[in-house]
Amino acid sequence: MAFNKLESSNNQEIISEEVGILKELLDDATRGMAGEQGLTTIQHLVELYDEGDYEALTQAISEMTNDDMVVASRYFSLLPLLINISEDVDLAYEVNRKNNIDESYLGKLSETFDVVAESDNARDILENVNVVPVLTAHPTQVQRKTMLELTNHIHELLRKHRDVKDGLINKDKWYADLRRYVEIMMKTDIIREKKLKVKNEITNVMEYYNSSLIKAITKLSHEFKRLAVEKGIELDNPTPITMGMWIGGDRDGNPFVTAETLKLSATLQSEVILNYYIEKVDNLYRSFSLSSRLTEVSETVAEMAKLSPDTSVYRENEPYRRAFSYIQSKLIQTLLFFKAGNFSKERAAKRLSENVRLGSVSTGEVVADFVHDRLSQSLQAVSQQTTEFYETAEAFHDDLLAIKNSLLENDDSVLISGDFEELLQAVEVFGFYLATIDMRQDSSVHEACVAELLKSANIVDNYSELTEVEKVAVLLKELQEDPRTLSSTNVSKSETLEKELAIFRTARLLKDYLGEEVIKQHIISHTESVSDMFELAILLKEVGLVDTERARVQIVPLFETIEDLENSNEIMKQYLGYDIVKRWIKNSNNYQEIMLGYSDSNKDGGYLSSGWTLYKAQNELTNIGEERGIKITFFHGRGGTVGRGGGPSYDAITSQPFGTIKDRIRLTEQGEVIGNKYGNKDAAYYNLEMLVSATLDRMVTRQITDPDELVDFREIMDSIVQDSNRIYRDLVFGNEHFYDYFFEASPIKEVSSLNIGSRPAARKTITDISGLRAIPWVFSWSQNRIMLPGWYGVGSAFNHYIEAEEGNLEKLQHMFETWPFFRSLLSNVDMVLSKSDMNIAFHYAQLAESEEVRSVFNIILDEWQLTKNVILAIEKHDDFLEESPSLKASLGFRLPYFNVLNYIQIELIKRLRNNNLTDDEISLIHITINGIATGLRNSG
């Protein structure tokens, strides 16, 4: 049975009505700032665009003053944002409605369970499935935290719109509240004045946990267990969703990530989840007013009640309340222990004695608004060291289980549902660490550090000059035969080595105190050899995280370029063959993770080449694991755009090569994608549900493509992809004018100066395309509306194949109909092309200084037109997005506004490059960049 995507159910009538209200309010705010004439100018620009008179539009914008530009840039940036909010509210409404009335939709967990339950190994699948979204700080989320908060206020008001229409809420007050927030938004700085620090990135992401992720993950995990019970499947401790984090641990190309940021990331995460627990326990304290005169309690709960700091005579007969008071006291002590920084009891006590003038224990940080008598007693107990802290989350969980068992034993099981059940579930998922932090560094840094260590220990003077075979021999000898560390406190170290060792020491400390789950992987960027992995092992050995039997941090290679992906098969064959590696993997439950880089492989070889090389690499690596009895699991380094591996998550997962998803999958969530997917608890629940359902679906679905046909399909793809790679590289790396075209006909220079992340736009000074990071590369092509990384080279390659032999078009059409991977591949191109605009791109091309450079656009335009024709022919469609009517309607709402913004951006870039903008006015370009990214929704 086929189900519709939930997005296809959206109510365009309601969205249109809300957009009308929001536009009216934005018009009023604009009129207040710029007068009637200012608003008239804006409306005139929209009319010119609607009429298709782009020359007149360009002329009108060129005649605007810089002051006019200020208002227009804000207007055209904010309206797409307001449209986004309305669409998000409608999606949240549909999520709740369809779940409450038990109506089907694609990816609904209960529907997926029906399929899984029919499998012979249903229990194993459900027990072991684990999907891990990993939040990263890649710089494509350009909104300020303040703007995100305003967005949430408007979101909450729009959620009440249907109640307003039904007369359940006063319309005038609702409208006045909405007007106020739109007015504030119009007069608030949209972009950051200063570049983010790593700490800012960490705290920004933590807001998503507070507002949506903790609630959504807890709810989904509970629903997962409930459905298993409903199907009669007994599970021990399933973890369908856990979270990952790169911020604070990803130092590849980011010199601002240090041991301190790693510790900060871990401790802030602990604070967030402990604050959540403290709040939940407080709620339970308030509600569990059961009297010992009317109900029995277990001896364990009675003992907890005796230890409670709550000695009020009014609660002496309320054992559950006093037990929760005891638990909360321990949680507060635990929180202070982690906030102490060096994880010592003495430091925690000192911090407490300095701050416990109640009202100043940083109670705002610690427990929000819970300053009342009971909390005073809890804090007093903590300050007097009469309450111990929880050394592990398991100990906290045990106390909660004791209360649960007491309720069950005494016929009070009805009280377990609600807050209590949510709290238990949250502890099982998040522990005291909240999310697993990944570490990442470039392989060249590891090599330099190991070379320095080997030289200082008088083992090898010129390690970097050794052959690969010689390097591996040296490294294995140190790992297998010599238990001593290479570093010495008596030998001076380079700044790089000192910094790396400090990070690894901190990782060891965090694992010792917060548990093994807090840091589980270290990723090696640009993995090109086995020695790259053993070099990391040497550094981990220095701090006791690796020995001959066990690696407490798994070594994860990242294969990024086309060449590295093609070589990954041979590299992993060799690596997995070493006895020491076999022992490490055996002690990791026979899992070996491999990260796949979508961004760099795309920049290296184009969309088709990247997608196909990744597909083949997964098949080959999975086979290597199966031959050795090892579960190879993949970490997909996907961005928001198709050019960086993005696209609909459900389709992306269900189109993975058959058999390559065992039970665990990790994938990056970055930039504006985090806000779009997890900005509110309903959207977060839906998107997490999609990930889990898609993974389960791919695990249980039998191969639907005929195996014999698949052999033919692969041969066809090999031929087409080779051609596509050549066409792409001929332009990007072979055309002598392409470099200048990219830097002159796109806002790459302006994007690089945006204050949207702590990491530089390039690892070093940019002298060619290969030196540019993939994110600003893709982001800039999104801004000038060419979207080149998502389609270039596709049209010509397919066209060459079609023209080579009669009937080849029909073969491609058959592949599209029967092969999920191919269908997903082409559907993403369809979506990208729908968001591109060659009229706008033409005007960006005019920014180039010479005719030779501008001529590059003609090459791009010809390929775009060819790609459009070929894709529609293979799909048998007349227009883009025929299978995504909701996205088509969404673009129809927003295109007239953020398309005008592109023309404004072009004019501002002209003025900037002619030195006709002040420093304050330069920020207008950044506002337009923000607005276009907001309108596209997946720009980097």
From Swiss-Prot:
The active site is at residues 138, 603. One of its GO terms (biological process) is tricarboxylic acid cycle. Keywords: Carbon dioxide fixation, Lyase, Magnesium. It is an enzyme of class 4 (lyase). Its EC number is 4.1.1.31. InterPro entries: PEP_COase, PEP_COase_bac/pln-type, PEP_COase_Lys_AS, PEPCASE_His_AS, Pyrv/PenolPyrv_kinase-like_dom. GO terms for molecular function: magnesium ion binding; phosphoenolpyruvate carboxylase activity. One of its GO terms (cellular component) is cytosol. It catalyses: oxaloacetate + phosphate = phosphoenolpyruvate + hydrogencarbonate. The keyword Magnesium applies. Belongs to the PEPCase type 1 family. Forms oxaloacetate, a four-carbon dicarboxylic acid source for the tricarboxylic acid cycle. This is Phosphoenolpyruvate carboxylase. It comes from Streptococcus thermophilus (strain ATCC BAA-250 / LMG 18311).
